[in-house]
């Protein structure tokens, strides 16, 4: 049974008693930011739980309550930040106050109690891991010599598979196609092994990654209502988490054991496991290596696949933009087997298409939540200052900011041209109306790699193929409805039909 449903049944009588004794308190004369009225004890948990898409629901609430909005998720206070000015305050000006992570059951278990980058609490271990990843794993040099040749090979393979589907007049599941592409890149670069599409090992690997993503998004009662933590065991969700963790741990250990074999031939530049084993020491333990592999897989596969799905969704729904992007890539590239990274620099409209995709469909619609390490004061102006308590979870509403008409003209229109008017808008997190990869100390470490995967992948999709809706559908039938999850994903699968483009 759903753990949330069990909890709601049990919580109603407790909420009634709680209402008799609860009084809202002000701290140092300042109150918390405004927010919708929640249920006693439960807070706003029920409203968010029953919403079809949590980030859309939260974003709509913020339109009513403002750029700083308080929610109560059971016993946990939460702050939703929905303006560039307040995002800058949280992610830059007071970054040191807000740069830690809440320790949640799912992410805590899967990250080996925070031994990696994305979910680790702020501290010396996180700084050491971040430094090692920045200087060793995700460098421009490694992107050039490790990722690039693998990416170009996988692009050729993807184009070949799509050509076969086109010859057979078959519809293609876009997410499966694009995650196969991303999975092959990440697996080859991370541990030097490729899983073929018909190989049982790849099916197991992709299922494991999907199960891990589901656990990151899963609801654990103990995170928000500690006294009811036993419900996680009763519902079975804790057992599922333990099973997924054990499967993941065994998989990582087998990979590491293979790399430790003395007779194993080492690649010219070394894969990511090779690099980490060479740096193994006081802070980088075997569990740390496994935890960082989790970051690489979870951050590099689903996000790339979803970004390409939403890019193709937007282009299919906007044929003017599709044709303009195809004309650019085909006229600039001429006749080549594939579009490579050097070509991307000559395709400003294609790059604007990717930027516009990440504005409308940010990979993390609420970013990975941060947590306030101490009390602080936030406010848009002197008349609207609020006290933020320690241990408040902070969600930066990139979904809402990217669709706010105060900052974007015709925000719901897919219009890549807007980025020619604002060339300063990029992925570095310095313009706070545009934060697809976050900002500050916790900005995504793999921006360059993710950007290259999406740009090169999309360029080749537009260069080699024309695209039609699936059998029996029209372009107008294609929706862009998202679903719940830590990473943005499309609710309804996108099926598309490729047609080989014959270059004149």
Swiss-Prot record:
Residues 363-368 are annotated as: Substrate specificity. One of its GO terms (molecular function) is monooxygenase activity. Pathway: Secondary metabolite biosynthesis. InterPro entries: Cyt_P450 (IPR001128), Cyt_P450_CS (IPR017972), Cyt_P450_E_grp-I (IPR002401), Cyt_P450_sf (IPR036396). The record marks 118, 299, 303 as: Substrate specificity. Coiled coil: none annotated. Its cofactor is heme. The keyword Heme applies. The chain crosses the membrane at residues 3-23. Pfam families: p450 (PF00067). It is a single-pass membrane protein. It is found in: Microsome membrane. Induction: Accumulates in roots after wounding. GO terms for biological process: coumarin biosynthetic process; response to wounding. Its EC number is 1.14.14.-. It catalyses: psoralen + reduced [NADPH--hemoprotein reductase] + O2 = xanthotoxol + oxidized [NADPH--hemoprotein reductase] + H2O + H(+); 6-methoxycoumarin + reduced [NADPH--hemoprotein reductase] + O2 = scopoletin + oxidized [NADPH--hemoprotein reductase] + H2O + H(+). It comes from the Eukaryota. Disulfide bonds: none annotated. Heme binds at residue 444. One of its GO terms (cellular component) is endoplasmic reticulum. Keywords: Endoplasmic reticulum, Heme, Iron, Membrane, Metal-binding, Microsome, Monooxygenase, Oxidoreductase, Transmembrane, Transmembrane helix. Involved in the biosynthesis of coumarins and furanocoumarins (FCs), natural products required for defense responses against attacks by predators with potential medical and agroindustrial usages such as anticoagulant, rodenticide and artificial vanilla substitutes. Catalyzes the conversion of psoralen into xanthotoxol and of 6-methoxycoumarin into scopoletin. Can also convert with a lower efficiency scopoletin into fraxetin and 7-methoxycoumarin into daphnetin-7-methylether, and use 7-methoxy-3-methylcoumarin as substrate. Belongs to the cytochrome P450 family. This is Xanthotoxol synthase. It comes from Pastinaca sativa (Wild parsnip).
């Amino acid at each position: 049974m759903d753990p949330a449903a069990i909890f709601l049944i049990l919580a109603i009588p407790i909420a009634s008693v709680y209402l008799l004794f609860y009084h809202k308190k002000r701290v140092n004369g300042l109150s918390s930011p405004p927010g919708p009225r929640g249920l006693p004890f439960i807070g706003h948990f029920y409203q968010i739980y029953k919403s079809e898409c949590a980030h859309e629901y939260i974003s709509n609430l913020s339109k009513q309550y403002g750029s700083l909005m308080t929610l109560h998720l059971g016993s946990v206070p939460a702050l939703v930040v929905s303006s560039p000015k307040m995002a800058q305050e949280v992610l830059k000006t007071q970054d040191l106050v807000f740069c830690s992570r809440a320790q949640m059951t799912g992410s805590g278990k899967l990250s080996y109690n925070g031994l990696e980058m994305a979910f680790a609490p702020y501290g010396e271990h996180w700084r050491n891991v971040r430094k090692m990843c920045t200087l060793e794993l995700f460098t421009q040099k490694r992107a050039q010599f490790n990722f690039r040749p693998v990416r170009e090979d996988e692009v050729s393979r993807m184009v070949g598979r799509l050509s076969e589907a086109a010859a057979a007049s078959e519809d293609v599941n876009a997410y499966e196609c694009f995650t196969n592409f991303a999975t092959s890149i990440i697996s080859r670069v991370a541990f030097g092994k490729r899983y073929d599409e018909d190989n049982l090992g790849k099916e197991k690997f992709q299922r494991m990654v999907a199960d891990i993503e589901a656990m990151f998004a899963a609801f654990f009662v103990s995170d928000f209502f500690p006294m009811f933590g036993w419900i996680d065991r009763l519902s079975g969700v804790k057992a599922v988490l333990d099973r997924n963790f054990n499967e993941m741990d065994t998989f990582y250990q087998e990979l590491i054991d293979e790399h430790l074999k003395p007779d194993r031939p080492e690649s010219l530049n070394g894969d990511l496991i090779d690099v980490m084993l060479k740096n193994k020491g006081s802070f980088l333990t075997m569990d740390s290596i496994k935890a960082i592999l989790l970051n690489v897989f979870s951050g590099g596969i689903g996000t790339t696949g979803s970004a390409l799905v939403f890019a193709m969704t937007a282009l299919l729904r906007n044929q003017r933009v599709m044709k303009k992007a195809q004309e650019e890539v085909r006229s600039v590239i001429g006749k080549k087997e594939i579009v490579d990274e050097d070509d991307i620099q000559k395709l400003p409209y294609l790059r604007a298409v990717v930027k516009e995709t990440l504005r409308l469909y940010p990979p993390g619609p609420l970013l990975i939540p941060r947590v306030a390490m101490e009390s602080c004061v936030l406010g848009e102006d002197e008349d609207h200052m609020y006290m933020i308590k320690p241990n408040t979870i902070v969600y930066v509403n990139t979904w809402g900011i990217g669709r706010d008409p105060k900052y974007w003209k015709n925000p719901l229109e897919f219009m890549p041209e807007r980025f020619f008017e604002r060339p300063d808008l990029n992925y570095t997190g310095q313009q706070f109306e545009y934060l697809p990869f976050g900002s500050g100390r916790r900005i995504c470490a793999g921006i360059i790699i993710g950007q290259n995967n999406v740009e090169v992948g999309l360029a080749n999709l537009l260069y080699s193929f024309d695209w039609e809706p699936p059998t029996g559908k029209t372009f107008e039938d294609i929706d862009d409805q998202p679903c719940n999850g830590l990473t943005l994903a499309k609710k309804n699968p996108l099926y598309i039909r490729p047609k080989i483009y014959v270059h004149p």
